């Protein structure tokens, strides 16, 4: 089994990067036959800007550019996709959001039938989300941030494409908590990555066929 671990943080010495490494270690420890790839979006200088060229891809007027096609191929090779990211303003960083905007394109991640019904094309994909935040859990619950992130990311992005979000973790108090606690959690997630993925029932919830990109 193969995991693609996508990390979005500019500092290679960050806790976010360390957690990604621990997830990878857990994947290897679970079964020597498992494999993983860490996609460091900052190190590879992925351009997150959604340009006119990307809009042409969305309209099916042009094929995906080389950098987008390469990321799609990475995901196609994976049995599980793991996103590891710091939480900026109660959501994912622009680098990761732009990666999703460009890579999860019309025709590859989703499509529309002749009668404008949504066709979810990533039903085979199992997704694990690991957000790293500085605030405590009470803050996320009291203000509704945790639910808002699930609505936007778990449901709004991945369910729209048919992908099953198997686990969605918030590792909080990142600047106060003993890093070992979060590292142990990340390693355990890696160990169980493919076990829990098998339990995913991907019926999804309904979206209508409305285009998720505004053309105005």
Regions found by a protein language model. Give the residues of each.
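N-terminal beta1-alpha1-beta2 submodule of the flavodoxin-like/Rossmannoid cofactor-binding fold
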Residues: 1-108, 167, 173-176, 180-216
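Conserved anion/nucleotide-ligand pocket segment
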Residues: 162-166
């Amino acid at each position: 089994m193969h995991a693609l671990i996508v990390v979005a943080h500019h500092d290679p010495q960050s806790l976010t990067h360390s957690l990604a490494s621990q997830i990878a270690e857990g994947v290897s420890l679970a079964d020597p036959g498992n494999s993983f790839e860490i996609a460091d979006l900052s190190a590879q200088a992925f351009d997150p800007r959604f340009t006119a060229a990307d809009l042409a891809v969305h309209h099916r007027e042009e094929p995906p550019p080389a950098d987008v096609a390469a990321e799609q191929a990475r995901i196609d090779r994976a049995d599980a996709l793991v996103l590891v990211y710091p939480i900026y303003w109660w959501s994912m960083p622009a680098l990761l959001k732009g990666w999703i905007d460009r890579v999860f394109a019309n025709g590859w991640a989703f499509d529309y039938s002749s009668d404008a019904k949504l066709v979810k094309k990533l039903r085979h994909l199992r997704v694990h989300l690991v957000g790293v935040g500085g605030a405590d859990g009470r803050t996320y619950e009291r203000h509704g941030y945790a639910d808002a992130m699930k609505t936007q990311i778990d449901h709004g992005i991945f369910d729209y494409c048919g992908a099953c979000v198997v686990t969605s973790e918030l590792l909080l108090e990142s600047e106060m908590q003993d890093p070992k606690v979060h590292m142990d959690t990340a390693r355990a997630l890696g160990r169980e990555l493919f076990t829990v993925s098998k339990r995913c029932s991907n019926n999804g919830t309904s979206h209508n066929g409305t285009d998720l990109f505004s053309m105005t």
